[in-house]
Amino acid sequence: MTKTVSDVICPFCGTLCDDLEVVVSDDGKTIVDVYNACAIGAEKFMHAQAKGRVTRPRMQQPDGSYKEVSYDEAVEYTAQMFAKSKKPLMYGWSSTSCEAQSVGHEIAEKAGAIVDNTATVCHGTTLIAVQDVGIPSCTLGEVKNRADRIIFWGCNPTHAHPRHQSRYSIFPRGFFMNKGHKSRKVVVVDPRVTDTAKMADIHFQVEQGRDYELLSAFRVALRNEKLPDVVAGIPKEKIYEAAEILKSGRFGIIFFGMGVTQTLSKNHNIDEAIMLTKDLNEFTKFSIMAMRGHYNVTGSGQVLGWQFGYPFCVDLSRGFARYNPGETTSNDLLVRGEVDAVFVLGSDPGAHFPISSVKKIAQLPSVCVDPHITPTSEVSKLHVPVAFVGVEVGGNCYRMDNVPIDARKVVDPPEGVLTDQEFLTRVNKRLGELMGAA
């Protein structure tokens, strides 16, 4: 016999779907099937059962091979690394629970570390823009029930957030949107004809890197002022037409992704997008929201914010929190050789950072805490496997709209495998002993 666990939270992307049903074996140790999830979310649950999964810490040997060690040895190595380091980097935090993040920040305070999350290479520019000009936002529930004008700017949720459109933005029938897709107008701004663009009523194929110009043109068009014949590759007539469509809606939302945050102008793009949203509020109700990637990258910013006052790249090396993107961000620190140890949890910089940064990680004392074998685990001196948050252990996570949701445990982790929080708590305790002895 099997049993079904309902209302399960999906720990994949920032949409944090909360309607999954997971069928588990009678003994509660094996996942049999997953319902309501997208292909990627379902695979996250099934991958926890994968054969050959690493269940014990591995230490890199002088010849490059890995030798299995105990969790006690892993805790000792990690604590000693922090105790000896003058300026360690603690990076990641986006694929773990808020409880684990909180313990990690205690370690950072003791060790005088820099704490940075994956926003540093994706939506960090968004956070800078919000600090500049504020943000008129809302929840995804409001979007589902009220929004009749949807803009996807520089993002492709069909692939990056597969259930976003069916649960919240385009297709669902909401309280005031009882015809679903037919009740809405969808605008996509993207240089490429993506699968999201194919669903749009209007697709602006903007020239690469010229989003700032088009955002400014929309602000001009809202006031019926003059525009050049072509802006960023878009005829002015099309811009005026879209501006009227946006003004005529009852409630609108701009969803934006890394096509805006990591192209030319960076945070200034977001400044302009937020100001466009504020301008639209002179005519109708409009909000704006970042399409956050990892399922708890938003939570990492929240926990850092309420503990230290800044959402990412927090430098605690002087005994108090400092924040200066460009100086205290991970890649800048690694490339300049300013850190002497690296601790990675809930992220994979080995796959996504520039090779110059990855080489530095490989040369330094380093620890990677991850359930998977990843490019980062293969260049780190120590790999510590842990339980999957949202599958084998519960914990608090924040959805992309800053709504906290409790992930739930579905099955038990493999015997003897620690959770992120348990491992960090043991490291924190041992580090306290070492620092006290010093």
What feature does the model see in each segment?
Residues 130-135, 218-223, 301-309, 382, ...:
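Short, surface-exposed amphipathic charged segments that create phosphate/polyanion-binding patches used
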Residues 210-214, 225-323:
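Active-site phosphate/pyrophosphate-binding segments
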Residues 1-211, 216-221, 233, 258, ...:
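N-terminal export/assembly segments and adjacent metallocofactor-ligating motifs
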Residues 383, 389-390, 416-435:
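Peripheral docking tails and interdomain loops at the edges
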Residues 25, 91, 189, 255-257, ...:
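Generic beta-strand/beta-sheet core signal
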Residues 108-171, 177, 274-378, 387-392:
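Extended redox/cofactor-interaction regions of prokaryotic respiratory oxidoreductases
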Residues 190-192, 196-228, 257-258, 265-273, ...:
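Short alpha-helices
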Residues 100-104, 108, 215, 269, ...:
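Short, highly selective alpha-helical patches that border small-molecule cofactor pockets
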